[in-house]
Regions:
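C-terminal motif of bacterial Sec signal peptides marking the signal peptidase cleavage site
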Residues: 7-11
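Exported/periplasmic ABC-transporter solute-binding proteins
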Residues: 12-66, 70-76, 82-272
Length: 272
């Protein structure tokens, strides 16, 4: 009798457990593609969202802001990730600000150069200056690290310094911020430019790089926040149409105060 009672209780408890798992109305999968700057942030937000909604999976893939725009338009991604403002020809898309960031120049930590003027940066990237001793550093051939086409970090950098990508004479072309940081950290003669958030996070975790000021303004998250840093940008999620259902719930969550600590931990600026 006891065994029968036990079996009966077990059989009764299973539907209840199943019911509790399916009680959350949010179910399904979202695919996010695009900016390598936004991707780590979106992935962490995604993990938090998944923990609240066990029936949901968030798949985050990087590849550049151009990919985020293209995939959102074509419907190959539910949400695109774009680390810049939308262009006039992209206004058919819906944009949602989730954080702010800046772009700055980085050097290997042991490089004695502490700052570069805008003109010196332009001269280095256009091949007019090729040795560190020409800008007050040690004798050493400069390794110029540039971003690949389609990266919004490149667009922002080039726009600020009034450069065309065809003007830039680079020895190394990289994709995401992590590649750029690793390349510069491993080469005392390298110069690159990356997301301030990514660079600050790496430097705080003992990666041997340093962030140079731009226009005399220190490259810090705080200066992006107070609006004094000259190269700043919005970090956006984009959709083809007004989001609904699971996509809307995720975007609302990504814009909420619930993710403020995640944004700050990634060294970005909270948007609200």
């Amino acid at each position: 009798m006891g065994l029968a009672t036990c079996l009966s209780l077990q059989s009764c408890s299973r539907p209840q457990a199943a019911a509790s798992k399916s009680a959350d109305p949010l179910q399904g999968k979202l695919v996010l593609t695009g900016s390598s700057t936004v991707a780590p942030l979106a992935a962490e937000i995604g993990k938090s969202f998944e923990s609240k909604h066990p029936g949901v999976r968030i798949d985050v893939q990087s590849g550049g802001s151009s990919r985020g725009i293209s995939d959102a338009r074509q419907g190959t991604a539910d949400i695109g990730m774009v680390s810049r403002a939308l262009k006039p020809e992209e206004k058919d898309l819906k944009g949602f600000l989730i954080a702010k960031d800046g772009v700055t120049v980085i050097l290997q930590k042991d490089n004695p150069v502490k700052s570069l003027s805008d003109k010196q940066i332009v001269d280095i990237y256009t091949g007019k200056v090729t040795n560190w001793k020409q800008v007050g550093g040690k004798d050493g051939t400069i390794t110029v690290v540039n971003k690949a086409e389609g990266r919004s970090t490149l667009e922002l950098f080039a726009h600020h310094f009034k450069l065309k990508n065809t003007d830039i004479k680079a020895q190394v072309v990289i994709g995401d911020n992590e590649q750029g940081i690793k390349t510069v950290a491993g080469n005392p003669d390298a110069i690159g430019y990356v997301s301030i958030g990514s660079a600050e996070y790496s430097a705080a975790n003992k990666v041997p790089i340093k962030l140079l000021p731009v226009g005399g303004i220190a490259a810090t998250t705080e200066n992006v926040k107070n609006g004094t840093f000259p190269i700043s940008r919005p970090l956006n999620l984009v959709t083809k149409t007004e989001p609904q259902g699971l996509a809307k719930e995720f975007i609302d969550f990504a814009q909420s105060q619930q993710v403020s600590d995640i944004v700050k931990k990634q060294n970005f600026v909270v948007s609200k």
